[in-house]
């Protein structure tokens, strides 16, 4: 009993408080969004309460595991996650592996419901890439361009195969989350700056060329380049770049812009949102918040997210070992991309992707994955405090 009390005292109270605010906001926003009548008698708010209860239990379990043990478990967790993605790929469409909106991303279990392996694989990739960097740095104390290039090669070797499988589901958004996590870990790994510039320069150059072609030669962009994409990707690009011209493809973008704009500064009030957005309790929950809470509440939520990210960075910066620092960096990368992509698509700055707003959107797999990541953060904080305590005693 005393051990449990000591463990709870070691948890980062500020991070827990921020998560509690997001928890309450999520449940309230989901409850309000389901009042529009499109969901029948389904109570997603109650389900989200259950999801959060389970999520906090998962958080505490992971937070109680030492970082050294997590590092040792990196390979087994990765292998289990990779195998689950392979199984999902090879099994035919069925009630166990359903195809929803043209994508086969889930296992559907009795009672438990749908589970998305790619969501949980984020943690496996975070753990293994961070562990790989730590071991590589210990092996090659004298850093050279060749050793840094070898490190990137190792990371690509364990990242590309699962990323390709996830991309084929199709789930492009999840692949970008993997890339964000890996990029942040590589950035903090201590590799030479010229290699970072080289790695960052390639996608920036490609993006710049695409923007130039879009502005100067729109016919080539739409008739030659966009047509190279898959049909669902073409639809999202067209709906993003000109939602009012391509009304079918850009319907969700139109409606979310209408919801955000109609909220004004103070909002319409709780439960008074009347703009219809398909599945607004999931990826478009921020539109509900902006419509009913207005600019004031929307800005408050954005500030809470920045507080969360800054708290994780502080914990990562004060971590007692490189492994903990790299985990924090990777998690910040994942959350930042989710945050900016989701809010960006709500206000029309980014294309619509199946990326949930972390801790606010309804969903079990996404929330559980994020809470497990917070458990990793708290484990880093706990380990650091234990380290400091032992030094003081010595």
List the model feature ranges, each with a label.
Residues 2-4, 28-29, 37-46, 50, ...:
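Membrane-helix boundary/helix-loop-helix interface segments in multi-pass membrane proteins
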Residues 50-58, 121, 292-312:
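Hydrophobic alpha-helical transmembrane segments
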Residues 314-353:
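Loop-to-helix entry and N-terminal half of a specific, functionally important transmembrane alpha helix
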Residues 1-8, 30, 342-343, 347-394:
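A juxtamembrane structural motif centered on a specific transmembrane helix
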Residues 75-76, 153-165, 172-223:
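Hydrophobic alpha-helical segments of polytopic membrane proteins
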Residues 176, 180-195, 273-297, 356-368:
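Interfacial segments of multi-pass membrane proteins
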Residues 57-68, 130-138, 183-192, 307-316, ...:
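Structural signal for the C-terminal ends of transmembrane alpha-helices
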Residues 200-297:
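Hydrophobic, glycine- and aromatic-enriched re-entrant/interface helices and adjoining loop segments
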């Amino acid at each position: 009993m005393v051990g449990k009390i000591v463990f709870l005292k070691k948890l980062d109270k500020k991070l827990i408080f921020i998560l509690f605010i997001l928890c309450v906001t999520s449940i309230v926003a989901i409850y309000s969004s389901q009042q529009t009548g499109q969901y029948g008698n389904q109570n997603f708010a109650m389900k989200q309460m259950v999801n959060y209860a389970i999520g906090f239990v998962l958080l505490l379990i992971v937070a109680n595991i030492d970082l050294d043990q997590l590092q040792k478990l990196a390979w087994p967790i990765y292998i289990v996650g990779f195998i689950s993605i392979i199984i999902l790929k090879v099994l035919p469409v069925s009630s166990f592996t359903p195809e929803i909106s043209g994508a086969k991303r889930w296992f559907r279990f009795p009672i438990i419901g749908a589970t998305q392996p790619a969501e949980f694989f984020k943690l496996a990739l975070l753990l293994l890439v961070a562990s790989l960097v730590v071991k590589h740095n210990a092996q090659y104390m004298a850093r050279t361009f060749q050793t840094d290039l070898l490190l990137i090669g190792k990371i690509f070797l364990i990242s590309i195969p699962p990323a390709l499988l996830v991309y084929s589901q199709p789930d492009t958004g999840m692949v970008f989350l993997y890339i964000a996590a890996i990029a942040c870990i590589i950035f903090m790994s201590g590799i030479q700056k010229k290699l970072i510039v080289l790695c960052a320069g390639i996608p920036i150059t490609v993006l710049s060329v695409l923007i130039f072609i879009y502005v100067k030669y729109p016919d080539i962009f739409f008739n030659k380049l966009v047509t190279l994409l898959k049909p669902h990707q073409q639809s999202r690009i067209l709906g993003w770049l000109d939602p009012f011209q391509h009304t079918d493809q850009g319907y969700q973008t139109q409606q979310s812009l209408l919801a955000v704009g109609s909220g004004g500064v103070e909002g319409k009030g709780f439960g008074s949102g009347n703009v219809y957005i398909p599945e607004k309790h999931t990826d478009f929950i921020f539109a509900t918040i902006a419509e009913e809470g207005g600019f004031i509440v929307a800005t408050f939520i954005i500030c809470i997210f920045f507080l969360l990210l800054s708290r994780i960075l502080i914990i990562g910066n004060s971590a007692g070992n490189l492994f903990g620092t790299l985990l924090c960096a990777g998690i910040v990368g994942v959350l930042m991309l989710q945050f900016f992509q989701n809010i960006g698509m709500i206000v029309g700055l980014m294309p619509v992707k199946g990326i949930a707003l972390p801790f606010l959107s309804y969903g079990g797999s996404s929330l559980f994955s994020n809470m497990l990541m917070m458990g990793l953060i708290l484990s880093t904080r706990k380990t650091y405090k234990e380290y400091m305590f032992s030094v003081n005693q010595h």
